[in-house]
Amino acid sequence: AVMGRNLALNIESRGYTVSIFNRSREKTEEVVAENPGKKLVPYYTVKEFVESLETPRRILLMVKAGAGTDAAIDSLKPYLDKGDIIIDGGNTFFQDTIRRNRELSAEGFNFIGTGVSGGEEGALKGPSIMPGGQKEAYELVAPILTKIAAVAEDGEPCVIYIGADGAGHYVKMVHNGIEYGDMQLIAEAYSLLKGGLNLSNEELATTFTEWNEGELSSYLIDITKDIFTKKDEEGKYLVDVILDEAANKGTGKWTSQSSLDLGEPLSLITESVFARYISSLKDQRVAASKVLSGPQAKLAGDKAEFVEKVRRALYLGKIVSYAQGFSQLRAASDEYNWDLNYGEIAKIFRAGCIIRAQFLQKITDAYAENKGIANLLLAPYFKNIADEYQQALRDVVAYAVQNGIPVPTFSAAVAYYDSYRSAVLPANLIQAQRDYFGAHTYKRT
């Protein structure tokens, strides 16, 4: 409801008169009452709402993904005319968007599945927008979407036509998976600095402030520096009294499930999903901590040196995560015939969204230089960073393993990097085993 309200206010602020409808009359009245003088026109029946719109109608749905979206579409259909456009701005599973696009197209309606990133504030002030559906329908809503989207530092709006049917929601799903990876990598860096150096919250804030002025400059690093020094009403550091159980809404899981369907090694992002799952086993972890032995963390030595190693490991881990995510976008584009433009996708993540970061420009540059590059790790900039930073990543992972500090995504980063650069892997033995017990056959070198 908040996302829908904020998007309506955003659209209204660009000079449009906006018809609004909610199943709850109270919520509709509340929005109007809270925003006097705004060009928000409330309607209390679907029929009146639909009939208030100019044709071709442009209807933005912001409802909970799943059955609720189908129910909302079904309630609209009796009052729609051919050529009307429904835009689904929810966190919808891309296969549902493909289905709805097909079904509505058959009835003469247009359907645009649209990823919207940036949370409640982004919805109001300018989100990153990822629309997918019929190109001609997108052209009819592009003027509105362009006006309400976030604007990058170079003045470009953070919205492009992504591709047919479910492409927009697929890109949003991978964006969310990358977000999971970024957050877990940052959490592991925090754990290493706290466990390896006993840094205070003030020192952590200072460290992250410095990091945010360099290669790691991003929204997530920026908010993390603030989180470290935020205190509760009792004067305690808030982060230290928050229970260590990370929730999830399932979009990271969808990204991992899709990687399995496509045969893509999305190991880092998948580990970040699993890290949230194991965090939720709090009671089991507390019990296991009293039974299972392991090393106690020893101090990591020179402070400045270790902080720099963790910074480098974090940046290279981030690069590996994005390399995996964009590799999956390529596989999906081939599978679903979307013809995705990876450099432009990286561009629209530069403002408005949760993963906005300075380094996204490097991804755009890499694809501008070589549109067909198989993996971002092979692009000159990222290859040079990997050459320079991999020792730090190895040292940090080795320290963590020796000292019993779990670093699932840092570990996944180095494992993927080494696997990807290996001309020969021990999979020949696995294939021999498969042939031995199941006559699966094999290829000779």
Curated annotation (Swiss-Prot):
PANTHER family associated with the record: 6-PHOSPHOGLUCONATE DEHYDROGENASE (PTHR11811)
Binding of NADP(+), residues: A1, V2, M3, G4, N22, R23, S24, V63, K64, A65, N91
Family: Belongs to the 6-phosphogluconate dehydrogenase family.
Keywords: Gluconate utilization, NADP, Oxidoreductase, Pentose shunt
Disulfide links within the chain: none
Name of the featured protein: 6-phosphogluconate dehydrogenase, decarboxylating
Top enzyme category: oxidoreductase
Function: Catalyzes the oxidative decarboxylation of 6-phosphogluconate to ribulose 5-phosphate and CO(2), with concomitant reduction of NADP to NADPH.
Membrane-traversing stretches: none
Pathway: Carbohydrate degradation; pentose phosphate pathway; D-ribulose 5-phosphate from D-glucose 6-phosphate (oxidative stage): step 3/3
Reaction(s) this enzyme catalyzes, per UniProt: 6-phospho-D-gluconate + NADP(+) = D-ribulose 5-phosphate + CO2 + NADPH
Domain of life, per lineage: Bacteria
EC number from the UniProt entry: 1.1.1.44
Molecular function, one GO term: NADP binding
Subunit structure: Homodimer.
Lineage: Bacteria, Pseudomonadati, Pseudomonadota, Gammaproteobacteria, Enterobacterales
Residues involved in substrate binding: N91, S117, G118, G119, H175, N176, Y180, K249, R276, R434, H440
Catalytic residues (UniProt): K172 (proton acceptor), E179 (proton donor)
Species: Citrobacter freundii
Keyword NADP among UniProt keywords: yes
GO terms, biological process: D-gluconate metabolic process; organic acid catabolic process; pentose-phosphate shunt
